[in-house]
Amino acid sequence: MRVFLLFQTALSGSQSLETNGENKMKEQLEKLFNHNSLSFTETQDAFSEIFEGKVDPVVLGSFLTALKMNGYSADEIGGAATAMIGAAEPFTRDNSVDVGEIVGTGGDKLKTINISTISGIICATLGLHVAKHGNTAVSSKTGASDVLTQLGYNVRTSKEDTRKALEDEGFAFFFAQVYHKGMRFAAPVRKALATSTIFNILGPLTNPAHVNYELLG
């Protein structure tokens, strides 16, 4: 009987915690459903939960869809990007060297090659330092890592090798799956939605190398 009571108490506490989290997300969803934007803090909190794997996939799908249907506000983009950077794997580099990036948001449905990646390689051959941040294809035909893998480039190098490549060769790839591990919780939902989401905008804003300049397409 005592064991049963302890189990019941633990279960009750667990359900209470789950309900609090669900209620918070439901409030944000209700706000979006009524065509109201979220504040910077609300969005940051929501995406922090996402990157910790605390959001149910069905709820996450609804959340991403509602955000897209409303149109993204500056506070929503800023809050989400701040949460993503905060959850990212840290990377340090030589800040005395200017580093740039050429990047697109993806999701154009044109089924073309990943042009930004090829452009970045060309720029590196001309003496520029390019920190290419990217992922496998989610809402596009090809992603940056897809192109580089086909070219024989190792997209999962260590931080030290990545740093050396950036300094010595002028080009290094920062694989989103390595530096933004919390994205794995959103990946299946993004794949199922098969459309661009706010994550397409966040990618160019969250380069782990903290680039000095960026050409965004």
Regions inferred by a protein language model and the residue ranges of each:
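Short, Lys/Arg-enriched N-terminal segments with co-localized hydrophobic residues
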Residues: 6, 13-24
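Acidic, glycine/proline-rich low-complexity segments that act as flexible tails and inter-domain linkers
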Residues: 22-111, 126, 130
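A glycine-rich phosphate/pyrophosphate-binding beta-strand-loop-alpha-helix module
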Residues: 64, 113-169
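General beta-strand structural signal in soluble alpha/beta enzymes
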Residues: 101, 130-134, 155-158, 173-175, ...
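Acidic, glycine-rich active-site loops and adjacent beta-strand->loop/helix elements
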Residues: 104-109, 134-140, 179
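Phosphate/diphosphate-binding glycine-rich loops and adjacent basic-rich segments that engage nucleotide
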Residues: 161-217
